[in-house]
């Protein structure tokens, strides 16, 4: 159920490396379900330099706030402006239309430190 | 199941601005009795004042009907854990409204307000006595402001002793959100300490984190789990030996009035919530008052002003090394009057009886509900009991749903999802002011709901059904904020 | 008619009730329930006086109240942040209803629509008063609202200095200092001249308008100064002045706060009051305090609920916009009822009564030999008079005549007194004051 062409973090983010080498980042279906209806998302500004696992923003539901962490080192190229007016995209389509950040100049060697789809699914099973 | 008949009327859906009719007036003012004076230039004046225009009867009916949509202590059992929703004696409101109390200007010459200052001085003494501390400041206007003052006092204490590196405040994971928020406002880093399986602070975890950076610890006693810390003396000791100070969140004092004094247990400073323990009305979210009580070594740092007796008269003064003023004047005097009257009506024995009956009532509820609901900790509780709806969650119904269903039974819900460390928490605090008949009716309702969960879960998960409005779309409220009337809407 | 010495009318439990409950719990005495408290600390003695019956309690409080009579009767010309203004009877009638008075914070909206809709109305009227976009449900008082406004400006701009115009109320400055000290935020004073060039890293320019001395500031100029420095304009204003003076929002102020006490709240020796807090909608997520929003319920009915709670302490804990929890909801309700009762015409009229009476008083006092008005500009309902003798002496004499004189500000202006005139002062009151001052000036 989790696409194979991506890597996953233990903080429930997914990373998709695009054809031009840039990385698309979002949160997983598990994460959006845990959060409940997303009402607001705070994303980093374009040009921000981030180190792997650094906090890069926040996702809010009615009763909770969750930090967003970047799964890779890189520079923020753009963020998904559609989420400003339509945060519900994160709930409805977390792996596609609900994408959050596009990173450039990423450290692709870090992909190995992340989980594959099946590893992530096992990780979820352990969480119970 | 509806307990207030007026709730059968549909709520008025219009706002004041929508009721407004040009030319209507709510009150008449006397005509100008001095010669008209030259006005400022027109660029300094406003041309339009968009307030409603209503006649007086319309105003009265609008707000009276609005009030009828509320549950309140005067109308319903209100067992909100850690809120101490006890009866608010009417005589307290009456005496607080006396012109000699309600109409004094705060900056009037002190010689003309000795009655007010005397009341404040006595109240300071009573609260110092109850808390086992050396001195009290009444300047803080709520518990959270008391907490902020307390952490600022701790900060000042360490700075004066050349210990600026002490920037860490320890806070249990069960603490009320104001504790870490106040610590952060006080410039501290917060470190969370876990609780153990008995609902006590994990002493081993505590010992591992104390070091030279420790400023202090913020503890609620009894804890937000309604449990008395078994190792309280040792906790205070560990913190003191590491050079830190102990702050007490007094929100749960209703369990301890006349039973123990936090100052004697080892606390250095604490706040008290007059709008909880001392019966002053909650008002839908305030006014409150959060007096700060301190041991001798911290008393000089108390927020000011405080009232002193110089032998001839009462005076407002700032403590020698005060952290400063936290309000424009001297605190919420109108609330102080009510608390003073409450203490005078009860006396020491009466205060002790408050905590006895509060703890008795909570344990009675626990005894009667522990078969149908899970108890997070199987031990005697104090003035509140934390149940977990984890059993019901397995049947598809959550704590939230049970809370909403209680509204249909004519009870205000208990506190939900707090403390955070208990799954599907329902924190129930009956207070001493409820009769056994009310407690039994509540027990019956909770047992009935437990049955419904088994037999007709939908009626619980879609509750409430009989209140003026049903469950609200809170997601929409957050996604599309509509926070005020706008013209042309 | 001997009663048990511990009989309290506030507690229903009889000995029989207690017995039954102890049996159900399975312990033999109430003290068994306190077993977790170490023995050495159990049941300490309290030095509280013995309990009073209700009748005795009334007598006791009436006696204390009577000692304050000189502060309460007679005309009042004292302002400086707390004001004797007209309170319509409707305000207390509504505020004393048990459903408003004894309810809790509206966390269960289905049974709190009264409180929630009243908050929504309060937010609406606060915005309309100051011509601002968004308001919260109120804070403790005008001083802490201003302090929170300054801290909010620091969060929004990510800067750490707070400039304040030196005509700010001294007690407001003290509260601002208390709140900013621990967060490494540095307030610094500016004059009307030096405000033109604010220091770099200034988060906001704080202006009281009308200022502490009662005079209007040049908000247009000060707004420009703030913009030039990339800082926010934070204005602490007065809600009665808002009845006739152009509101701070119309000058582009980013945050406008005020003390709500003049809106139908008794002076009550300094509290409880309510802090009004408004800001531009772009800063909504940094707004402290509670906010009520309008939504619908599952049947599509309009309904009100606390919203955007993720800003607050119970969710965001140490990262909250403020630690505030219990605020001043009932006082906010009183202000709302006051504004609904006075309304569009009534508030304007109150403001004009204050203005004309204050200016009449100023004009006759400055004609008295020895008295002058040392400050220039436009004042609203307060002004400073320079006296021929120390204000302390003048006020002592006035008090003997049953008149509450203005605030002694001789530490700021030589022999200066800050006089306040409201709609509650009759022409006779003002003439009597002038006569007394004339006598004292001989």
Predicted regions span which residues?
Chain A
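Periplasm/extracytoplasmic soluble domains of Gram-negative envelope assemblies
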Residues: 21, 62-64, 72
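Basic, polyanion-binding surface patches
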Residues: 86
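Histidine- and aromatic-rich ligand-binding microenvironments
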Residues: 67-71, 104
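A short beta-loop-beta micro-motif enriched in histidine and acidic residues
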Residues: 36-38, 62-65
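Short, conserved catalytic or interaction motifs in soluble domains
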Residues: 61, 81
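Acidic, low-complexity mobile loops and tails
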Residues: 1-55, 93-128
């Amino acid at each position: 159920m989790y696409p194979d062409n991506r890597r996953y973090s233990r903080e429930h983010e997914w990373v998709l490396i695009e054809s031009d080498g840039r990385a698309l980042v979002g949160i997983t279906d598990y994460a959006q379900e845990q959060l409940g209806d997303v009402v607001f998302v705070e994303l980093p500004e374009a040009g921000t330099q981030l180190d792997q696992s650094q906090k890069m923003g926040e996702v809010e539901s009615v009763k909770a706030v969750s930090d967003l962490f970047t799964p890779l080192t890189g520079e923020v190229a753009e963020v998904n402006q559609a989420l400003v007016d339509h945060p519900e995209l994160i709930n409805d389509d977390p792996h596609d239309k609900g994408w959050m950040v596009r990173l450039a100049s990423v450290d692709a060697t870090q992909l190995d430190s992340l989980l594959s789809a099946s590893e992530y699914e096992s990780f979820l099973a352990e969480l119970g | 199941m509806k307990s207030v008949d007026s709730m059968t009327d549909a709520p008025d859906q219009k706002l004041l601005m929508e009721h407004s009719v040009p030319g209507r007036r709510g009150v008449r003012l006397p005509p100008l009795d001095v010669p008209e004076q030259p006005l400022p230039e027109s660029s300094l004046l406003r041309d339009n004042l968009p307030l409603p225009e209503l006649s007086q009867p319309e105003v009265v009916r609008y707000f009276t009907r609005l009030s009828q949509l509320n549950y309140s202590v005067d109308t319903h059992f209100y067992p909100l854990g850690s809120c101490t929703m006890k009866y608010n004696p009417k005589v307290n409101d009456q005496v607080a409204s006396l012109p000699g109390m309600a109409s004094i200007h705060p900056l009037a010459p002190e010689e003309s307000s000795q009655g007010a200052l005397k009341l404040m001085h006595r109240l300071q003494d009573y609260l110092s006595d109850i808390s086992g501390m050396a001195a009290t400041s009444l300047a803080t206007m709520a518990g959270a402001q008391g907490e902020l003052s307390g952490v600022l006092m701790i900060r000042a204490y360490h700075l004066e002793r050349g210990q600026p590196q002490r920037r860490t405040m320890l806070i249990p994971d069960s603490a009320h959100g104001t504790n870490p928020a106040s610590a952060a406002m006080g410039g501290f880093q917060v470190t969370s300490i876990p609780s153990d399986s008995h609902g006590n602070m994990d002493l081993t975890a505590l010992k591992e984190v104390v070091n030279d950076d420790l400023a202090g610890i913020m503890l609620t006693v009894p804890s937000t789990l309604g449990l008395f810390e078994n190792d309280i003396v040792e906790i205070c000791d560990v913190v003191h030996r590491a050079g830190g100070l102990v702050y007490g969140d007094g929100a749960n004092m209703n369990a301890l009035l006349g039973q123990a004094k936090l100052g004697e247990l080892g606390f250095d400073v604490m706040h008290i919530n007059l709008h909880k323990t001392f019966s002053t009305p909650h008002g839908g979210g305030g006014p409150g008052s959060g007096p700060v009580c301190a041991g001798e070594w911290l008393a000089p740092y108390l927020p000011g002003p405080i009232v002193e007796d110089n032998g001839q008269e009462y005076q407002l003064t700032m403590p020698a090394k005060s952290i400063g003023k936290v309000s424009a004047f001297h605190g919420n005097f109108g609330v102080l009057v009510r608390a003073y009257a409450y203490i005078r009506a009860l006396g020491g024995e009466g205060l002790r009886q408050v905590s006895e009956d509060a703890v008795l009532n909570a344990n009675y509820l626990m005894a009667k509900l522990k078969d149908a609901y899970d108890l997070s900790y199987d031990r005697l509780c104090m003035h509140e009991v934390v149940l977990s709806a984890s059993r019901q969650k397995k049947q598809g119904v959550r704590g939230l749903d049970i809370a909403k269903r209680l509204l249909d039974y004519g009870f205000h819900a208990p506190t939900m999802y707090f403390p955070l460390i208990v799954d599907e928490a329902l924190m129930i605090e009956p207070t001493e002011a409820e009769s056994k008949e009310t407690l039994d009716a509540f027990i019956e309702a909770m047992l009935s709901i437990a049955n419904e969960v088994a037999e007709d879960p939908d009626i619980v998960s879609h509750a409430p059904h009989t209140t003026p409005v049903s469950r609200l779309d809170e997601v929409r409220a957050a996604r599309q904020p509509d926070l005020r009337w706008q013209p042309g809407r | 008619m001997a009663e048990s010495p511990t009989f309290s009318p506030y507690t229903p439990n009889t000995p029989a009730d207690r017995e039954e409950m102890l049996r159900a719990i399975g312990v033999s005495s109430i003290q068994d329930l306190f077993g977790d408290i170490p023995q050495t600390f159990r049941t300490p003695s309290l030095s509280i006086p013995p309990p009073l019956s209700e009748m005795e309690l009334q007598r006791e409080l009436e006696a204390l109240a009577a000692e304050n009579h000189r502060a309460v009767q007679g005309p009042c010309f004292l302002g400086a942040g707390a004001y004797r203004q007209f309170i319509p009877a409707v305000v207390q009638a509504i505020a004393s209803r048990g459903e408003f008075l004894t309810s809790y914070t509206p966390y269960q909206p289905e049974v709190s629509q009264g409180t929630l809709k009243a908050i929504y109305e309060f937010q609406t009227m606060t915005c309309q008063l100051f011509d601002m976009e968004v308001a919260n449900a109120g804070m403790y008082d005008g001083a802490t609202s201003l302090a929170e406004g300054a801290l909010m400006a620091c969060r929004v701009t990510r800067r750490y200095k707070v400039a304040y115009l030196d005509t700010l109320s001294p007690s407001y400055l003290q509260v601002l200092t208390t709140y900013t000290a621990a967060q490494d935020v540095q307030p610094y004073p500016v004059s009307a001249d030096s405000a033109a060039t604010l220091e770099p890293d200034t988060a906001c320019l704080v202006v009281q308008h009308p200022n502490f001395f009662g005079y209007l500031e040049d908000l247009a100029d000060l707004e420009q100064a703030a913009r030039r420095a990339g800082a926010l304009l934070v204005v602490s204003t007065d809600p009665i002045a808002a009845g006739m003076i152009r509101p701070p929002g119309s000058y582009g102020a980013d945050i406008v706060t005020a003390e709500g006490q003049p809106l139908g709240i008794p002076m009550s020796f300094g509290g409880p009051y309510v802090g009004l807090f408004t800001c531009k909608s772009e800063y909504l997520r940094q707004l402290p305090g509670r906010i009520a929003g309008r939504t619908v319920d599952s049947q599509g009915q309009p309904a009100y609920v606390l919203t955007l709670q993720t800003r607050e302490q119970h969710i965001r804990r140490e990262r909250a916009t403020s630690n505030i929890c219990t605020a001043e909801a009932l006082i906010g309700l009183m202000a709302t009822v006051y504004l609904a009762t006075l309304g569009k015409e009534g508030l304007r009229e109150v403001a004009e009564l204050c203005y004309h009476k204050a200016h009449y008083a100023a004009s006759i006092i400055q004609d008295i030999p020895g008295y002058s008005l040392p400050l220039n500009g436009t004042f609203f309902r307060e002004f400073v008079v320079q006296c021929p003798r120390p204000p302390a002496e003048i006020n002592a004499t006035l008090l003997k005549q049953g008149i509450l004189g203005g605030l002694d500000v001789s530490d700021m202006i030589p022999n200066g007194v800050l006089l306040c005139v409201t709609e509650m002062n009759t022409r006779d009151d003002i003439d009597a004051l002038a006569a007394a001052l004339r006598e004292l000036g001989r």
